[in-house]
């Protein structure tokens, strides 16, 4: 199994953006020396939720500082961008990195970001689908053109040409069942953020596989992104997770405003309206403890030995062959984030990477996993 780290650069009260960014960049610099296989950058705008407005630019920095590690986006939100510009930047990063990039795409769910870019949210899904098709065509054809609903592109060529067929390493973030269907039909792999009970996430992944096969695509194993809290004792790992994942949850709702229910009436985002009840409960002090415990239970929170057991079960359910981790979240002090990362790298990651038991997952049958629930669903990373 491959193991990566994602940089989710959340602001901290009382700390400058520069200092917070420096802390996360330091974790990024540790990824290759500690033996991680990949480093992922997010895209978000206009709030302190994740200060990473240009993931390809950030990864270009690491392309020059690393030799081996794969570089991934989690994700580029296509409806906010000109697809030609995205294709050019992908091709350039592919060249300067020596073809060691993974490109994740998504459609976003934060109204503040859509408003900031003057893009109607109800156009998100068709914009995503059209932009994705353009990017694939631009990178697989020497010369191409396009006449669509949102984009009209004259005959042109992308230069420099990519060196390693990056379209074969395209993934897309899947939260709703509808998104999984879109990704499967496009032939993309799927990047799943663990925000639902594991059997339910497994059922959505199986649905993606079934759709991909039905339209002639070979489904790839999913990339799974999750938060990690590992410590020598379960109590210490749990205490850290409860404190900082609770704060992360607050930052999610501050950015997405799921608790106000506004997405329930936006075409293409009805699924997110189901999150309203869950997020509203987090604003209720009488329910907050229980809700936080449920969110923490979805993540990997344990001792090193228990981590291996939990990840074996997660792999069995999902068929993942690439785990992407977050060690710094919710304003966690840098020293504690680094300790979290180092302990995982020393005692958990080598087994994941080298033990044959983690090389070829044995998947559950579709009937063993439940369909996506209407409640108990969380937000993107």
Cite the ranges covered by each PLM segment.
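N-terminal beta1-alpha1-beta2 module of alpha/beta enzyme domains
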Residues: 1-71, 165-168, 362-371, 375-381
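Flexible, glycine-rich active-site loops centered on histidine and acidic residues
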Residues: 2-19, 79-146, 150, 190, ...
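Hydrophobic faces of well-ordered beta-strands that scaffold small-molecule active sites
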Residues: 3-7, 39-41, 71-73, 101-105, ...
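Active-site mouth loops of central-metabolism enzymes
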Residues: 7-21, 76-84, 164-174, 231, ...
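Short, acidic/polar
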Residues: 18-30, 89, 174-181, 306-313
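Acidic (Asp/Glu)-rich catalytic clusters
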Residues: 32, 59-67, 90-100, 181-185, ...
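Conserved, mostly hydrophobic/aromatic
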Residues: 35, 43, 62, 93, ...
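An alpha-helical appendage that flanks or caps ligand/catalytic pockets
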Residues: 124-158, 199-320, 353-381
């Amino acid at each position: 199994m491959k193991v990566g780290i994602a940089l989710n650069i959340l602001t901290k009260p009382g700390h400058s953006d520069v200092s917070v960014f420096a802390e996360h960049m330091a974790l990024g610099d540790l990824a290759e020396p500690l033996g991680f296989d990949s480093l992922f950058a997010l895209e978000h705008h206009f709030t302190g939720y994740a200060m990473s407005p240009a993931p390809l630019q950030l990864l270009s920095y690491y392309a020059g500082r690393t030799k081996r590690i794969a570089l991934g986006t989690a994700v580029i939100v296509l409806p906010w961008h000109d697809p030609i510009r995205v294709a050019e930047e992908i091709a350039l990063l592919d060249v300067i990195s020596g073809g060691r990039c993974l490109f994740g795409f998504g459609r976003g769910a934060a109204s503040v970001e859509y408003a900031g870019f003057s893009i109607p949210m109800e156009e998100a899904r068709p914009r995503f689908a059209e932009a994705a098709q353009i990017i694939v065509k631009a990178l697989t054809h020497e010369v191409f053109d396009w006449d669509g609903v949102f984009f009209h592109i004259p005959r042109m060529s992308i230069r420099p040409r990519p060196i390693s067929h990056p379209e074969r390493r395209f993934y897309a973030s899947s939260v709703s069942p509808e998104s999984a269907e879109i990704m499967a039909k496009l032939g993309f792999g799927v990047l799943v953020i663990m925000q639902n009970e594991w059997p339910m996430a497994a059922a959505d992944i199986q649905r993606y596989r079934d759709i991909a096969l039905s339209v002639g695509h070979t489904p790839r194993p999913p990339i799974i992104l999750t938060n990690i809290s590992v410590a020598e004792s379960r109590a210490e790992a749990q205490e850290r997770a409860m404190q900082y994942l609770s704060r992360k949850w607050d930052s999610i709702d501050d950015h997405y405003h799921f608790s106000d229910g506004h997405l329930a009436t936006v075409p293409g985002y009805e699924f997110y309206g189901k999150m309203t009840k869950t997020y509203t409960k987090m604003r209720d002090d009488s329910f907050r403890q229980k809700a936080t415990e449920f969110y923490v239970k979805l993540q990997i929170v344990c001792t090193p030995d228990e981590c291996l057991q939990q990840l074996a079960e997660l792999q069995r359910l999902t068929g993942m062959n690439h785990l992407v981790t977050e060690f710094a979240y919710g304003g966690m002090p840098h020293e504690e984030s680094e300790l979290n990362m180092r302990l995982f790298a020393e005692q958990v990651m080598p087994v994941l990477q080298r033990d044959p038991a983690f090389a070829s997952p044995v998947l559950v049958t579709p009937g063993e996993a439940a369909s996506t629930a209407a409640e108990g669903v969380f937000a993107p990373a």
